[in-house]
Curated annotation (Swiss-Prot):
UniProt-listed SUPFAM superfamilies: beta and beta-prime subunits of DNA dependent RNA-polymerase
EC nos: 2.7.7.6
Enzyme class: transferase
Catalytic activity from the UniProt record: RNA(n) + a ribonucleoside 5'-triphosphate = RNA(n+1) + diphosphate
Complex formation: In cyanobacteria the RNAP catalytic core is composed of 2 alpha, 1 beta, 1 beta', 1 gamma and 1 omega subunit. When a sigma factor is associated with the core the holoenzyme is formed, which can initiate transcription.
Binding site for Zn(2+): C71, C73, C86, C89
UniProt protein name: DNA-directed RNA polymerase subunit gamma
UniProt cross-references to PANTHER family, sorted A to Z: DNA-DIRECTED RNA POLYMERASE, DNA-DIRECTED RNA POLYMERASE SUBUNIT BETA
Biological process terms in GO annotation: DNA-templated transcription
S-S bridge residues: none
Name of one Pfam family that matches: RNA_pol_Rpb1_3
Amino acid sequence: MKPAQDTRFDYVKIGLASPERVRQWGERTLPNGVVVGEVTKPETINYRTLKPEMDGLFCERIFGPSKDWECWCGKYKRVRHRGIVCERCGVEVTESRVRRHRMGYIKLAAPVTHVWYLKGIPSYMSILLDMALRDVEQIVYFNAYVVLDPGNASNLSYKQLLTEDQWIEIEDQIYAEDSDLYGIEVGIGAEAIQRLLQEMNLEEIAEILREEIAQSKGQKRAKLIKRLRVIDNFIATGSLPAWMVLDVIPVIPPDLRPMVQLDGGRFATSDLNDLYRRVINRNNRLARLQEILAPEIIVRNEKRMLQEAVDALIDNGRRGRTVVGANNRPLKSLSDIIEGKQGRFRQNLLGKRVDYSGRSVIVVGPKLKIYQCGLPREMAIELFQPFVIHRLIRLGLVNNIKAAKKLIIKGDPSVWNVLEEVITGHPVLLNRAPTLHRLGIQAFEPILVEGRAIQLHPLVCPAFNADFDGDQMAVHVPLSLESQAEARLLMLACHNILSPATGKPIVAPSQDMVLGCYYLTAENPQSQKGNGRYFGNIDDAVKAFEHGLVDLHAYVWLRSEDPNEEVVTDLPDTEVLKTETLEDGSVIKHYRERRVREIDGEAVSQFIRTTPGRIIYNKTIQDALTVA
């Protein structure tokens, strides 16, 4: 047995695999010395016995048993035969889950190019060969020959393209009796491309390119730099350009491309099985044609069909006609499974479903503090259930977990009190997809609310790029003390006032907040109710408005706490409009926006002309600053 691999690693690097590496992935030597791993038959399962066909796409000898601890022929059953390889069928007695990671391979009768490197943007194959993509395609798909060695012919050059007619003409000249031509070699298909790539000396080409770059400029220089960058990457990773042409293709584990039986006895299968079957059929047919020395034109056509089959397997529809299945639906290739929103990376690896998380619509919570969020009770009891159960048992309200769950389902009032205690000081993380920057996920202190919607402070919306037209957000509960501390110290919404990208404030009032501020402080000459009334303090003015004694925009006089307080107005307010002397000798000076009472030239009280709306606005800001 192989020693257990150390699972610790720093990073994963994706690169080109050599034919030997691909073979290693799928090849295994059985204890009896038999080497298995090559898939040679297109069959999947036997429709009578419903067992996988040997050497086929679901072969138990290559990929492992379909049933736990049971070989294909049934000679060995049960776990006591663990590790034995059946002498009759050659299947190792082990768990069936090995079929999720054991791979196979198909040895191709002729090399084929990898469609990603040929038809990708940019085309690395054409950049490396310093040829036009159209020309490389002509060679790969058997539409043109390429000169591999011009020999002593003066009218031929290395990598020159030739049509069928041109090559026949040159061939006639070579085989003529009086011909002095020799050493001419031409090729066609992926084999010719493989030969050209094998003949490349990367270090030498890189040196030549560096010299040329120093002497050139403009578009030519940019093209040379592009080619040099690709060559340098090949040198740095230790990959060979010839590996872009495939001699062996891997067959992914059968449980990742399953075949399941439906109720009516029919089978549903992964599209990959159809694509692999096409490759194997064409590969076997090509091998047979080569064996019987079939005419070149037939062999060449079969090689082209094999190239197209491998292209469809790797990336269906990238080049040529898309391969379709039943109902004219395009078959899903390996690329389709990996890429996009529903692909393996974004759907299954990055987008895993996790415990202790919930999701709901967001609504505005204007009464919340910026670092708070409203969490529906129904969601909170589910998210914090383990914590609530633990606390219920510790408080002695229940004796075991089962009783605690019953109490929670019943909705006992004591449960809500315990939940309040549990969530106090326990931050939760709110995330809105797509999380485009680090402020897309922030921590908040949960406040229990009625209803089924998460309440969010309107000021944090710009960071999440959220609005309240049906947006949804996910809630996550940090479990460990370290994650809770990190959430509180680094991720709490009140610590994320500035954008990390620009350094400018990302928390700024907008829309209805700006409208509300404007409405509170605006003027409205039609608001006359309570106009000209005097109030001794802010609270009296606010209460008068709340009881409907004055309008929000009516001008009233409010006593200032500091008689010498400077009142800021749009226009200078220094001109005394009227002076009034009282019986006690004090003087009241009437200004446009204030009234000041003075005794012996010293101000003893001051009334400011304002509106209840402006008083409320000022009071709210003062209260917020005082609390902070």
